[in-house]
UniProtKB/Swiss-Prot annotation:
InterPro entries named among the record's database cross-references: GcfR_halob, GfcR-like, PRibTrfase_dom, PRTase-like
Name of this protein: Transcriptional regulator GfcR
Stored CDD domains: PRTases_typeI
GO biological process: pyrimidine nucleobase biosynthetic process; regulation of gene expression; UMP biosynthetic process
Originating species: Halobacterium salinarum (strain ATCC 700922 / JCM 11081 / NRC-1)
Highest taxon, organism lineage: Archaea
Record keywords: DNA-binding, Transcription, Transcription regulation
């Protein structure tokens, strides 16, 4: 079982490979703020015991690698997500996967629904520090266009809601209609984002000291 010191080591290894802090957040299924905190702890060689202060992030790490490493398990999750999303529409003809980890889930979901597939790379993948306002996300030209399509948006984890909100807005700006979102785990307990309902297979709620 991993502890926070293990996550600090993982963040350091990912940073050494040249990943941005936004990409590290995506790999570890934590917020950008948590990813920055982990990298900073690694840079100072500080254990979590030495840095457990009121400034420490309040987050939950979700490790779904046991699912991700096996095609049959991914397919099963795709079936479950597709079943949940069908409650919102049977006429959707496109699934949009959020890069990186959301794409395998979106592929399995699209396969179960018999729809086309699009992918979106959020701006956080370019982020290291400072304001993200000057950065932008993009749809891959190697997959289907979202223009004039009714879409389901699929990701692995909702951490703050920022990435899935960005993707919903990007779909609309590109001429598509986001009908609903499907995620493996929701750490915020969001019922909808920007008017688009969210179906989560798991609701993850942090309970403990430091909660307001």
């Amino acid at each position: 079982m991993k502890n926070v010191d293990d996550l600090i080591d993982d963040a350091a290894a990912l940073a050494d490979r040249g990943l941005s802090r936004g990409e590290i957040a995506d790999e570890l299924n934590v917020s950008r703020e948590t990813a920055s905190w982990l990298v900073e702890r690694a840079d100072t060689n500080a254990s979590v015991a030495a840095t457990d202060t009121d400034d420490s992030p309040r987050d939950v790490h979700v490790d779904w690698s046991t699912i991700g490493e096996a095609g049959a398990r991914l397919s099963a999750i795709g079936i479950a997500l597709a079943d949940a999303l069908r409650d919102h529409s049977h006429d959707v003809d496109l699934v949009v996967g959020i890069e990186k980890a959301g794409v395998p889930l979106a592929t399995a979901t699209a396969n179960e629904l018999g729809t086309d597939l699009a992918t979106y790379t959020p701006r956080k993948h370019q982020w290291d520090e400072g304001d993200m306002a000057d950065l932008g996300g993009s749809f891959s030209r190697n997959f289907a266009s979202v223009e004039d399509r009714d879409c389901f948006v699929v990701d692995d984890t909702v951490t703050s809601g920022t990435t899935i909100t960005e993707t919903i807005q990007a779909v609309r700006e590109a001429g598509g209609t986001p009908v609903a979102c499907g995620v493996l785990a929701d750490k915020q307990g969001l019922g909808d984002v920007d008017g688009t309902p969210i179906e989560a297979l798991l609701q993850v709620i942090r309970v403990g000291s430091g909660d307001d």
